[in-house]
């Protein structure tokens, strides 16, 4: 016979609080890597498409995650993620000059 699972630890924070925290973190990171005007236009597109709904919040989270992932994968010039450090040092030391 099936039984309900026992209470396993503290209650997780509500989904909407967690979702808004994630959105704020992604927005802060996106502003460091993309033009504000471009992000504003993206926000306007999401608002026009979804209105002021949770579906819109989830959509913009998904899009920002994908954009930041691709940005880092290609090789962000704002961080060391995706950059070959040896190439970076050679350029700084002038080793690539002919």
From Swiss-Prot:
Keyword Transcription regulation: yes
Modification(s) after translation: Phosphorylated on several residues by host. These phosphorylations regulate VPR activity for the nuclear import of the HIV-1 pre-integration complex.
Alphabetical list of InterPro entries matching this protein: RetroV_VpR/X (IPR000012)
Region annotation (Homooligomerization) ranges: 1-42
Compartments, record wording: Virion; Host nucleus; Host extracellular space
Classification via Pfam families: VPR
Modification Phosphoserine occurs at: 79, 98
Primary site of residence: virion
GO biological process: DNA-templated transcription; monoatomic ion transmembrane transport; protein homooligomerization; regulation of DNA-templated transcription; symbiont entry into host cell; symbiont-mediated activation of host apoptosis; symbiont-mediated arrest of host cell cycle during G2/M transition; viral penetration into host nucleus
Record keywords, A-Z: Activator, AIDS, Apoptosis, Cell cycle, Host G2/M cell cycle arrest by virus, Host nucleus, Host-virus interaction, Ion channel, Ion transport, Modulation of host cell cycle by virus, Phosphoprotein, Transcription, Transcription regulation, Transport, Viral penetration into host nucleus, Virion, Virus entry into host cell
Transmembrane segments: none
Key word tRNA-binding present: no
Annotated GO CC locations: host cell; host cell nucleus; host extracellular space; virion component
Miscellaneous note of the record: HIV-1 lineages are divided in three main groups, M (for Major), O (for Outlier), and N (for New, or Non-M, Non-O). The vast majority of strains found worldwide belong to the group M. Group O seems to be endemic to and largely confined to Cameroon and neighboring countries in West Central Africa, where these viruses represent a small minority of HIV-1 strains. The group N is represented by a limited number of isolates from Cameroonian persons. The group M is further subdivided in 9 clades or subtypes (A to D, F to H, J and K).
Sequence similarity: Belongs to the HIV-1 VPR protein family.
Subunit structure: Homooligomer, may form homodimer. Interacts with p6-gag region of the Pr55 Gag precursor protein through a (Leu-X-X)4 motif near the C-terminus of the P6gag protein. Interacts with host UNG. May interact with host RAD23A/HHR23A. Interacts with host VPRBP/DCAF1, leading to hijack the CUL4A-RBX1-DDB1-DCAF1/VPRBP complex, mediating ubiquitination of host proteins such as TERT and ZGPAT and arrest of the cell cycle in G2 phase.
Reported function: During virus replication, may deplete host UNG protein, and incude G2-M cell cycle arrest. Acts by targeting specific host proteins for degradation by the 26S proteasome, through association with the cellular CUL4A-DDB1 E3 ligase complex by direct interaction with host VPRPB/DCAF-1. Cell cycle arrest reportedly occurs within hours of infection and is not blocked by antiviral agents, suggesting that it is initiated by the VPR carried into the virion. Additionally, VPR induces apoptosis in a cell cycle dependent manner suggesting that these two effects are mechanistically linked.
HAMAP family to which the protein is assigned, alphabetical: HIV_VPR
Protein name in UniProt: Protein Vpr
Organism: Simian immunodeficiency virus (isolate MB66)
Higher taxonomy: Viruses, Riboviria, Pararnavirae, Artverviricota, Revtraviricetes
Gene: vpr
